[in-house]
Amino acid sequence: FKVKTGFSTHAEDMSRLERLAAILPADASLRIDYNQGLAAVDAIRTLRDVEAFRPAFIEQPVARDRRDAMAEITRAIDTPILADESVFTPQEAADLVARRYADAVSIKLMKAGGFTAARTIAAITGAAGLPA
């Protein structure tokens, strides 16, 4: 189950996640997408709270251009961090590989500019052992 968060207060997000966790089967996979909704200064503290729900991954917690913050989050949080809006081009994929600001990448054909660019992004990140 993928949950979009980061548009409400942290308390409201936590309440929503608690309600969802109460009704999901124990073996359900929870994926949390912040859609760049967290302020970098609060992200690690917020995501440590969210880790209580054992998400499979946390997607794009901060703004796409906050790659230094993404790197700090990736090092500080046990849950894998998935880059989405941070990687639209092969150059951004190379930057991800060099700086390791996420544990995996979400590749979308439309955002990448088509199949060829998406394959290039997958090749770059895959060669570095980052799942797509």
Describe each region flagged by the PLM.
Residues 48, 54, 65-82, 87-132:
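Shared catalytic-loop signature of beta/alpha-barrel
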